[in-house]
Protein backbone atom coordinates (compact mmCIF):
# COMPACT_ATOMS: atom_id res chain seq x y z
CA UNK A 1 0.00 0.00 0.00
CA UNK A 2 1.29 3.46 -0.85
CA UNK A 3 2.00 6.16 1.68
CA UNK A 4 -0.78 8.53 2.70
CA UNK A 5 -0.38 11.99 1.26
CA UNK A 6 -0.69 15.15 3.29
CA UNK A 7 -3.37 17.62 2.16
CA UNK A 8 -1.48 20.60 0.76
CA UNK A 9 -4.01 23.14 1.99
CA UNK A 10 -3.87 21.75 5.53
CA UNK A 11 -0.09 21.85 5.80
CA UNK A 12 -0.16 25.55 4.88
CA UNK A 13 -2.85 26.43 7.44
CA UNK A 14 -2.25 24.24 10.50
CA UNK A 15 0.64 23.28 12.78
CA UNK A 16 0.80 20.35 15.18
CA UNK A 17 2.35 20.95 18.59
CA UNK A 18 4.54 18.44 20.41
CA UNK A 19 1.65 17.59 22.74
CA UNK A 20 -0.62 16.80 19.79
CA UNK A 21 -2.72 19.97 19.75
CA UNK A 22 -3.47 21.77 16.49
CA UNK A 23 -2.76 25.48 16.05
CA UNK A 24 -4.30 27.68 13.37
CA UNK A 25 -4.28 31.34 12.48
CA UNK A 26 -6.99 33.55 13.91
CA UNK A 27 -9.92 34.04 11.52
CA UNK A 28 -11.52 37.33 10.54
CA UNK A 29 -8.62 39.50 9.35
CA UNK A 30 -8.99 39.50 5.57
CA UNK A 31 -11.07 42.64 5.11
CA UNK A 32 -13.42 44.99 6.92
CA UNK A 33 -10.86 46.14 9.48
CA UNK A 34 -12.15 49.72 9.36
CA UNK A 35 -15.23 48.84 11.41
CA UNK A 36 -13.29 47.01 14.08
CA UNK A 37 -11.76 48.63 17.14
CA UNK A 38 -7.97 48.57 17.57
CA UNK A 39 -8.45 46.12 20.43
CA UNK A 40 -10.39 43.72 18.21
CA UNK A 41 -7.68 43.90 15.53
CA UNK A 42 -4.95 43.30 18.12
CA UNK A 43 -6.79 40.28 19.51
CA UNK A 44 -6.91 38.73 16.03
CA UNK A 45 -3.11 38.46 15.91
CA UNK A 46 -1.31 35.22 16.52
CA UNK A 47 -2.69 31.72 16.56
CA UNK A 48 -5.43 29.80 18.36
CA UNK A 49 -5.65 26.19 19.49
CA UNK A 50 -8.43 24.27 17.78
CA UNK A 51 -11.13 22.47 19.73
CA UNK A 52 -10.65 18.71 20.16
CA UNK A 53 -13.43 18.01 17.65
CA UNK A 54 -11.86 20.18 14.95
CA UNK A 55 -8.35 18.94 15.78
CA UNK A 56 -9.45 15.35 15.19
CA UNK A 57 -10.56 16.24 11.64
CA UNK A 58 -7.41 18.21 10.85
CA UNK A 59 -5.13 15.41 12.08
CA UNK A 60 -6.57 13.13 9.40
CA UNK A 61 -5.32 15.63 6.81
CA UNK A 62 -1.81 15.62 8.34
CA UNK A 63 -0.81 11.95 8.60
CA UNK A 64 2.90 12.81 8.75
CA UNK A 65 2.47 15.41 11.47
CA UNK A 66 3.63 18.46 9.56
From Swiss-Prot:
Organism field: Maricaulis maris (strain MCS10) (Caulobacter maris)
Region (Disordered): 1-35
Entry's Gene Ontology BP terms: translation
Family to which this protein belongs: Belongs to the bacterial ribosomal protein bL35 family.
UniProt name for this protein: Large ribosomal subunit protein bL35
InterPro entries for this protein: Ribosomal_bL35, Ribosomal_bL35-like, Ribosomal_bL35_CS, Ribosomal_bL35_sf
Record's keyword terms, sorted: Ribonucleoprotein, Ribosomal protein
Entry GO terms, CC: cytosolic large ribosomal subunit
Basic residues: compositionally biased ranges: 1-15
A Pfam family that the UniProt record links to this protein: Ribosomal_L35p
Single GO term (MF): structural constituent of ribosome
Amino acid sequence: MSKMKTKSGAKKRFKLTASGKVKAGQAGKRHGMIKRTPKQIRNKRGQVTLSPQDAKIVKKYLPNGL
